[in-house]
Amino acid sequence: GMDHLDLFKPETYEFVDALFREYLEGRNPVFTGKRVHIGTDEYSNKKQDVVEKFRAFTDHYIRFVEGFGKQACVWGALTHAKGETPVKSENVLMSAWYNGYADPKEMIKQGYDLISIPDGYLYIVPAAGYYYDYLNTEMLYKEWTPAHVGKEVFPEKHKQIKGGMFAVWNDHAGNGISTKDIHYRVFPAMQTLAVKMWTGKDCTVPYADFNSARMAISEAPGVNVAGRIGTEPRSVYNLETLKPGMETGLKEIGYHYTVSFDIKAEAEEKGTELFRSPDAVFYLSDPASGKLGFIRDGYLNTFNYQFYPEETASVTITGDEKSTRLYIDGKLKE
């Protein structure tokens, strides 16, 4: 397809070689860790000549990144792309995501080390309607370990299963999901898998206790991407009257938030701001339509509501990681 590299053209290798060199060589390389993931996944297997080219491409870039002292990582695809062209397996780390693409038993037999990342358990695709919006952390905590690769179950602590991970795929741009929304999906998954990587099947703390305790753990020292203020819901800022240029002293207030204010509207020019933070701007009159709206992550989101001059209203805006709602005089507008 148009989004695939043409494996039959020498120019493809020239381009990808140069790309990896740009990231791997020189005095200040981008990739400084021990491993480099070369990708290689989801090519059609309808034509055997394509399969053989795919296998040759995979083998080439395994050896290419090894030439920079890196361990190569690949996506599991070699059951789907079954062929005669040899692909190096020694000291290669394979992401085992779907057993139909890479049979984990066969891959282990061939000598690959595996990272367990079965898509049916560990794929997040935010607000897409397929895979998970949020991982089922309770099921993962109670039932899953890296030894469970899809429906295949291996002995715990198998020497060729090096661990597990989850994935977030942002398949749909412009669907309202922000980087903050993704963070709220990622962090509980990260906390849960961290425990599972450490304890395996030997979790002794009940899930309810773990789930409660994890909420009190900060993201990292000095880090608060979620914008939490304390651990309990409470009012964090009250003011009788707002004046232009006033600052709250708060960087941000994370989900689940409620902002309420009374307003007597005037005719506003398009682009008139009401609130601003490092992450978003809320408009009384957005730059495009003159309606209430907000911009974040480069996207303008507009409510189908516009104040008329001299209108008085009580306005409430609520937000969580799935939606932002507008209430006028206590009634949900959008």
What is each residue range found by the language model?
Residues 297, 327-331:
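Short strand-turn-strand beta-turns centered on an Asx-Gly dipeptide
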Residues 259-261, 310-319, 324-328:
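Short tryptophan-centered beta-strand motifs in secreted/extracellular beta-sheet-rich domains
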Residues 292-314:
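Short, aromatic/His-centered strand-loop micro-motif at the edge of beta-sheets
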Residues 2-91, 97-110:
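Active-site neighborhood of glycoside hydrolase catalytic domains
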Residues 234-295, 323:
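Extracellular glycan-recognition modules
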Residues 334:
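Flexible glycan-contacting loops in extracellular carbohydrate-active proteins
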Residues 84-92, 98-239:
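Flexible, acidic glycine-rich loops studded with aromatic residues
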